[in-house]
Amino acid sequence: MATPITSRTETLQKYLKLDQKGMIMAEYVWVDADGGTRSKSRTLPEKEYKPEDLPVWNFDGSSTNQAPGDNSDVYLRPCAVYPDPFRGSPNIIVLAECWNADGTPNKYNFRHDCVKVMDTYADDEPLFGLEQEYTLLGSDNRPYGWPAGGFPAPQGEYYCGVGTGKVVQRDIVEAHYKACLYAGIQISGTNAEVMPAQWEYQVGPCTGIAMGDQLWISRFFLHRVAEEFGAKVSLHPKPIAGDWNGGLHSNFSTKAMREEGGMKVIEEALKKLEPHHVECIAEYGEDNELRLTGRHETGSIDSFSWGVANRGTSIRVPRETAAKGYGYFEDRRPASNADPYRVTKVLLQFSMA
């Protein structure tokens, strides 16, 4: 097996400190056809940039399965800008939407339709908080810390665990946390999950389209950090067979839900969501049927359910929300590999329509 090549950070530092002569590096990031991120860099004059100030760029869409070879140019339209935690100030990370040459959004540009829904219900002040679970793999595609050819002890000591034998690769988690904070991502926490080598971080609360933007950039950061440590990141909802899975639990509320009497508004929203269960599942990630079995703190993929403090349902209403009579609810159906634009779009649209 080849030895993974990790970043030589101490060697890189002397180059990162070099004067850039009034120029900056802008890393354009986009979502590809496979639900991953791609990026490439360009040089720009140093100044403060808003998305509308940045040039539209392009890439070879035939190499990312986003365009045919005979019409391969896909355009990158900047939509959000963040400080670059890898190169440092004044360099920037640019999140971009993908557009076709004829002026239509690319097939895999799910942000475009999400913006429309967010704008429609902007007066309702929708807030989202997403819980991203992921698994760290070695070069052999096995979870870090697992015995060769075998399985670890049953879950129980790993969730929020501390100490050797309970958690692995905490350095990646810490580095990713700091990178998000530096870039202004509204990361709100992190914890070890129920499977060794599985972790979770939370982003939010965020308003409207900022939720999808920030989660995608946080995923990009996670892969970049893991790259430096020679690790792979899996967002698969069932990374390995057993009593564990990966979700993107999605917390949601509107202004009316957060005010006195909001519990009634939540119940009305859940009634509206129920008939759209199949449509939601179609937007909630790949291979989700392996995860939503009705076991291991999941609801069944075949039916819609909700309950107070019940993690075995489609929707969980927190105990505190039920007790106070207002707050938020958690959609537990999205898989860990779900596109946050697709999730937040249908969650808002179907609970309000």
From Swiss-Prot:
Per UniProt, residues of the GS catalytic domain are 110-353
InterPro entries (alphabetical):
Gln_synt_N (IPR008147), Gln_synt_N_sf (IPR036651), Gln_synth/guanido_kin_cat_dom (IPR014746), Gln_synth_cat_dom (IPR008146), Gln_synth_N_conserv_site (IPR027302), Glutamine_Synthetase (IPR050292)
Disulfide linkages recorded for this protein, renumbered to the chain, are none
What GO CC terms are in its UniProt record?
cytoplasm
In alphabetical order, the GO MF annotations are: ATP binding; glutamine synthetase activity
Q: Tell me the superkingdom of the source.
A: Eukaryota
Key words of the record: ATP-binding, Cytoplasm, Ligase, Nucleotide-binding
Major place of residence: cytoplasm
- Kindly list the places in or outside the cell where this protein is found, as annotated in its UniProt entry: Cytoplasm
Q: Residue ranges of the GS beta-grasp domain? A: 24-103
Q: Name one GO biological process term.
A: glutamine biosynthetic process
The protein's annotated catalytic reaction(s) are:
L-glutamate + NH4(+) + ATP = L-glutamine + ADP + phosphate + H(+)
Q: Name the residues that span the membrane.
A: none
EC number(s) stated in the UniProt entry for this protein: 6.3.1.2
Q: Which Pfam families match?
A: Gln-synt_C, Gln-synt_N
List, alphabetically, the PANTHER family matched: GLUTAMINE SYNTHETASE, GLUTAMINE SYNTHETASE 2 CYTOPLASMIC
Family affiliation = Belongs to the glutamine synthetase family.
This protein's assembly is summarised as: Homooctamer.
Query: This chain belongs to which protein, by name?
Result: Glutamine synthetase
Q: Which organism is it from?
A: Fusarium fujikuroi
Q: Which gene encodes it?
A: GLN1
